[in-house]
Each structure stands twice: as C-alpha cells, then as structure tokens.
Amino acid sequence: MDSNWINCPSVFSSSSSSSRRCQSRSDLYLGGGYEDLEGEDDLKAEFICPFCAEDFDIVGLCCHIDEEHPVEAKNGVCPVCTKRVGLDIVGHITTQHANFFKVQRRRRLRRGGYSSTYLALKKELREANLQSLLGGSSSFTSSTNIDSDPLLSSFMFNSPSVNQSANKSATPVTVGNAATKVSIKESLKRDIQEAPLSGEDQEKAKKSEFVRGLLLSTMLEDDF
C-alpha cells in the first residue's frame, strides 16, 4: 500500500512531463522559426509510429509517442531517418528533423489561407448579388437607383398613368350600367301600361279618371 502511494507521484510527474513535452511540440509546430529548405514540399506529411504502426503527421507522432510510448521512446528507431536512437526519439525528431515542423505549419497555413480567401470571396459575391437585387443600396427607391435601373424606373413612373387609364375605362362602364337600368325600368312601365286590363281594373281606371276630372274642374272654377 505504501509502495503504491510512493510510486504515485512518479506516475503523476511522468504524466505531467509528457503533457508538457506534447505542449512544447505543439508550440514548436505552431511557432515555426525554421529556415526554408529546398524541396521541402516533397517531404512526407505522415509517418508511422515505430511502436504501434499507426500513421500520424509529425506533430501528432511526437505527441503520440510522448503520451502512449514514453518508456519505449527511450530506445527505438527514428521513423523519419530509420536510425536507431538510444536516448529520446521525440527529442531526436525535434532537433534533427525540425524542418518537418516548418513544412507542416506552412501546409496548415496554406489550407487556412485558402479557406479564408474562399469564404471572403463567397461573401462578397453573395453581397453583390443581394445588392443588385435590391437596386444597389437599402434606399433603392432613390432617384439614383431608379435612373440606374430602367426597368424599375419604367415601373415607378408608368404606374400612375396605368391607374388613371384604368379609372377612365371604368367610368363609361358605370354610366352604361345606369343607362341600361333606366331603359329596363322604362320598358317594364311600358309593358305594364300596354298590358290588357281586366274588367275590375277598367272600372277602377274609369273611376279614377272621373275623380281626376272633377278635381281638375273644381280647380279651374276656383281660378276663375
């Protein structure tokens, strides 16, 4: 029990030192600081771990060896130059093959630069298309935008005339409808007047004419 507790600090210290080494590899990879070498683009991008035969890039390989094979790394074959290293494989790679870190960093920056440039161009193209659809700016109804867009200007200036012509065409229709209604009413009255009357209706008509005649004669006598 005591021996386990005694060995625990060494385990923690080895784990923390491994993390620090991995962080230093990442800092080395991100920071660069190496001179450009001729033919560096032709160098391999991935390497095989000499202990588990997995593929990694140069930084991933160093971190993998630090974390997964800290004991075996003290004596093994360098995956870059295939030479046997008796002390520290990761230290050998970072010192003797530092140009691979520079190549890896440059490739990463190239990929990031391409993607950022592509996104910027795509954004500009989208904004240009949107601007052309809206007439060039948010205040697309201004005189400048109307003059620059003949289709929009024709629509803006011709719309009142279209409305006026529509109103003019609607007015005769209304007058014609009223005249048609008047003619229909007159024809109905004419039909009623010309229709044959029954006996009772004829008697009523005679009585009404007699009463009307009396009233007219009375009014004429009063005037004289």
Curated annotation (Swiss-Prot):
Q: Could you tell me which cysteines form disulfide bridges? A: none
Phosphothreonine found at: T117
TM ranges are none
* Compositionally biased spans, kind Polar residues: 1-12
Q: Pfam families under this entry?
A: Di19_C (PF14571), zf-Di19 (PF05605)
Regarding protein family, the annotation reads: Belongs to the Di19 family.
Q: What is this protein called?
A: Protein DEHYDRATION-INDUCED 19 homolog 4
Q: Which organism is it from?
A: Arabidopsis thaliana
Please spell out the taxonomic lineage of the organism that makes this protein. Answer: Eukaryota, Viridiplantae, Streptophyta, Embryophyta, Tracheophyta
